[in-house]
Amino acid sequence: MRLSDFRYTLPKTAVAEYPSEPRDSCKLMVLDRRKKTTDHKQFSDLLDYFKKGDVLVLNDTKVFPARLYGNKEKTSAKIEVFLLRELNKQAGLWDVLVEPARKVRVGNKIYFPNDLVAEVVDNTTSRGRTIRFLNPDIDIFSIVEKVGQMPIPPYIKRDPEEEDKERYQTVFARIPGAVVAPLAGLHFTNPLLKAIQDKGVEIISLTLHPGLSTFREVEVEDISKHKMDSEYYNVPYSCAKVINSIKEKKSGRVFAVGTTVCRALEANATVEGRIKFGEGWTDKYIYPPYDFKVVDALITNFHQPESTLLMLVSAFAEHDFLMKNYKLALKSDYKFLGYGDAMLIF
């Protein structure tokens, strides 16, 4: 398929600047792939679509305040450092983006609040650097929780607010490492999760830390030529065991909460539709046509034009059916992107 197949006009007024309150009060568009039907619900109505024996898979990654501001040694020039991913915990090595990049060279030291100090050890791209934190035996995540800024998405045209630290985080976030929230998970509340569990649905978790490549533009017209950045994942043995059991017994369906869960599961799926457990890095890229091995239902948001997220959802829902419903969503005043409304596809 071509990049132009995923092009549509997204008005600024359709992009949610703030989340729904409460979380599960947002709209929910429900697509039945087999019947080609569309229903309009509220997210809390998601409960009605589960049956006893189904499995709900969450991504328990936690967004950390990845944007730091420091001063360069000697000149005291203000430098923005955006933490992308931890490369080596023992060595204190991180991939980062810096701004202004022209002022940051290999060998420079940057001083942050709370006596945090880093040295630039490599240039990776025009704005990319590898830095080493020089403070021995410190927990970087605990420090950035105090001094960092929450990295809300670039399409939200306002400054981060204190509320974002709580709302740009799922209620089940546990493992720090993401610079982008697993967006579909933002709509769940603890009471809704309990109600789903009480219905006989098993709720399990895996981890995938999404990075800024989520927002990276696809620059090739032939979408098969696009390359994804690698992201860390961990599929626990307990998670794989539950999924493999229901697949073998054909006793329920696998509901993936978001494209991150979908990618982690499909990256670890065998041709027989079983899941391998373990951790590693994945650059799994899903676009039409794609034969899903594990995921039976997908909960997701409304995504940006020409994005890899839209391509994945298009592969799951069937391209023409999905794009028709994106047009309908815009006409029906659905809100799009990170703080916007949701979609269930089964």
UniProtKB/Swiss-Prot annotation:
Its EC number is 2.4.99.17. NCBIfam families: PRK00147.1, queA. It catalyses: 7-aminomethyl-7-carbaguanosine(34) in tRNA + S-adenosyl-L-methionine = epoxyqueuosine(34) in tRNA + adenine + L-methionine + 2 H(+). Monomer. GO terms for biological process: queuosine biosynthetic process; tRNA wobble guanine modification. Pfam families: Queuosine_synth. Keywords: Cytoplasm, Queuosine biosynthesis, S-adenosyl-L-methionine, Transferase. Gene3D superfamilies: QueA-like (3.40.1780.10). Pathway: tRNA modification; tRNA-queuosine biosynthesis. Belongs to the QueA family. InterPro entries: QueA, QueA_dom1, QueA_dom2, QueA_sf. It is found in: Cytoplasm. This is S-adenosylmethionine:tRNA ribosyltransferase-isomerase. One of its GO terms (molecular function) is S-adenosylmethionine:tRNA ribosyltransferase-isomerase activity. GO terms for cellular component: cytoplasm. Transfers and isomerizes the ribose moiety from AdoMet to the 7-aminomethyl group of 7-deazaguanine (preQ1-tRNA) to give epoxyqueuosine (oQ-tRNA).
